[in-house]
Amino acid sequence: EQYLTELDAFCKEQERVQREKQKEFKANNPELFCRYPKFSKALAKVLDPSDEIKPAATKEQIGNQESKLDFTFPSQVREFFLLTAGIQVSTGVILTLSGMFDLTIHGEKYCVLGEFWKEADGDQLLLRTGEESVWYYAHEQDKVKRLCNDLIELLEKKLANYLNQR
């Protein structure tokens, strides 16, 4: 009986901490909620105390990363990083400016935008030069598939739906 009382108290405290984190996320990121409402609402529901939402990147930081990678980001990707330098969610969504790198798969050059564990841990979201499209690399199958037309579709449809199912 004592155990159940303690477990109940622990669960209530965890819920309280999660609600606080969600409130804080919404208060600290009004532009994110305005620009990507479905994604932001879904993200707020699954936020865990260990998850991280970074503050906005500067144009200079974005430009430096583009230079380092020798890759021009699509306009929607630049806009996203001007709202947050990155999001790391334990349920399998990682999009960080500093974590981007280039990768060649089957002779094709890509820029890795982040991770999306749709099929397996470590599957990657990719960009190609001169395209708004977001590609998905399922590393266990060693296949690259076109996932979305652009970043807004990725955030507002694919990732929002994925997070809502968690």
Task: Describe each PLM feature range.
Residues Y137-N164:
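Compact, glycine/acidic-enriched structural inserts
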Residues E1-E131, R166:
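A surface-exposed partner-binding patch
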